Amino acid sequence: MQRPNILFCIADDAAWLHFGAYGCGWVSTPVFDGVAARGVLFENCYTPNAKSAPSRASLLTGRYSWQLGEAGNHICHFPEDIKVFTEALEEAGYDVAFTGKGWAPGNPGMKDGRKRQLTGEA
């Protein structure tokens, strides 16, 4: 069985109402709309934290901010004992990478003697 490709998009300062896939007629987002039409489009999502780094930490771990220790703060040291979904994907044989801003601001910590890449290689 072929594994699915996984594309996770985060757009700072954009809301659901800014994409055609959600019914917007005044902003053109044809590429996003095409990907959404062929994949999974979430319709009931809420931010767990109003700050960017804690919100991203929740997305990466599947945990609420209050469960993340120091990672629940805006500028922090990410706890080494908390695994992120990108690490689980790498362990399963996926290639993981990001473009733009991954998890930040803060210190992602170390893993296996090197700086931890919470969102994959840049």
How does the language model describe each region?
Residues 1-122:
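Formylglycine-dependent sulfatase
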